[in-house]
């Protein structure tokens, strides 16, 4: 099943994009399909000291409104863009902020906002 979501990215001078945090060496363009390197990761620790494990994915945000809210946390906004994406195999990120999801596959459709 294909859903829609949004992704905040860094916009490069040549018009391509990069992830903000992980896999920053990878650049991509609109209409590209990106597939997550699914592996087990951890976000934090349980009270007993054990790691909270989860299946990783590509971070996406459920709504444009939440993207705009999260964009405010970045000091530099002039090189950011919000991309409308088709997303597949989406799940809530454990212990993530509201609306933050993990997708196994995203297709970058349209740049809808440049701050």
Enumerate the predicted regions with their spans.
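Conserved NAD+-utilizing ADP-ribose enzyme module
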Residues: 1-58, 64-115
């Amino acid at each position: 099943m294909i859903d829609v979501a949004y992704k905040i990215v860094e916009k490069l001078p040549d018009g391509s994009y990069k992830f903000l945090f992980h896999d920053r060496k990878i650049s991509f363009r609109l209409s590209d399909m990106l597939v997550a390197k699914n592996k087990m990761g951890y976000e934090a620790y349980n009270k007993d000291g054990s790691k909270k494990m989860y299946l990783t994915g590509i971070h996406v945000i459920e709504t444009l409104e939440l993207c705009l809210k999260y964009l405010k946390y970045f000091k530099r906004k002039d090189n950011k863009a919000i991309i409308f994406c088709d997303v597949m195999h989406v799940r809530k990120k454990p212990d993530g902020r509201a609306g933050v999801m993990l997708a196994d596959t995203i297709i970058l459709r349209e740049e809808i906002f440049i701050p």
